[in-house]
């Protein structure tokens, strides 16, 4: 957290996107002035649970996954993911791990099951502990993106 604070001062970042991945793979999150970095790093930010499902609604107009009456999730930034955006030097971004609201009746402050990055981290840690191996994955570039002669 301290290193990121120093980097924010050095680079002149004045706004940070606190981001996470939705269940559809979309990057979503909340923008907060960089002056609040230390506080957000310790306490987190709150956002509606439905944001993990892109705030989509079903055909009846109800949020998918969580009702409008639900509490808000808590996002805690992962400082090692912080970087300054190359196309707008005033802005930084950091990925976050999501947790259930601290005031929930069931599992307060627990891991949020709709947090894709958090789930992957937990599953990978279990896998490493059980098998003493690392999961690795890669992408297969689609060759149809390329056209002969270009």
Residue ranges and their predicted role:
Residues 1-150:
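ATP/Mg2+-dependent ligation/transfer catalytic cores
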